[in-house]
């Protein structure tokens, strides 16, 4: 299953990142930053339609979507079109994402950014904050209940939102 491959690839990547820059350092840096105040709940409760636009270079099913990838220009166009938030893929192996996209976009737009990755470790949340994210995606099917609760609390502590993805597998009778 592709999700299992994505999680394993992420696990290997995060372990390397933690060897390069330990959790303690990343956590301290993130906690020293100004708390954010973006709330997905507030955005989706507005009377007008809100939309999240996505910055994605590739996908496992389609491969590379665009060789030429002016992600900053795309983000500026999304903001100009009225996007409420921009989702930035940072998963490098299957989606060809990069944390530099998140960081550089955060310096060029004023709307909130969602780090879209397969968050499996608290390290990734602190790292998302450092790279300019206002929100992270938490996927229930790859996290246990205690991890999910802990990660939501970390987001709260950092002034970030947690967008929790849950799906129910249903088979008809």
Describe every region a protein language model picked out.
Residues 170-173:
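Conserved small/polar residues in nucleotide/adenosyl-binding loops
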Residues 86-94, 112-120, 135-145, 161-168:
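Catalytic beta/alpha-barrel core
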Residues 2-66:
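An N-cap/entry alpha-helix motif that binds or orients negatively charged groups
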């Amino acid at each position: 299953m592709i999700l299992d491959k994505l999680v394993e690839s992420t696990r290997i990547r995060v372990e390397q990142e933690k060897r390069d820059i330990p959790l303690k350092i990343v956590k301290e840096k993130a906690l020293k930053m100004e708390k954010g105040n973006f709330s997905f709940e507030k955005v989706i409760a507005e009377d007008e339609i809100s939309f999240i636009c996505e910055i994605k270079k590739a996908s496992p099913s389609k491969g590379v979507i665009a060789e030429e990838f002016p992600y900053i220009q795309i983000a500026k166009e999304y903001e100009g079109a009225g996007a409420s938030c921009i989702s930035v893929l940072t998963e490098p192996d299957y989606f060809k994402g990069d944390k530099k996209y998140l960081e550089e976009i955060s310096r060029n737009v004023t709307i909130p950014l969602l780090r879209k990755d397969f968050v499996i470790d608290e390290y990734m949340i602190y790292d998302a904050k450092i790279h300019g994210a206002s929100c992270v995606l938490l996927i229930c099917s790859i996290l246990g209940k205690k991890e999910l609760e802990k990660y939501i609390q970390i987001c709260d502590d950092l002034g970030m939102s947690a967008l929790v993805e849950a799906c129910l597998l249903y088979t008809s009778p």
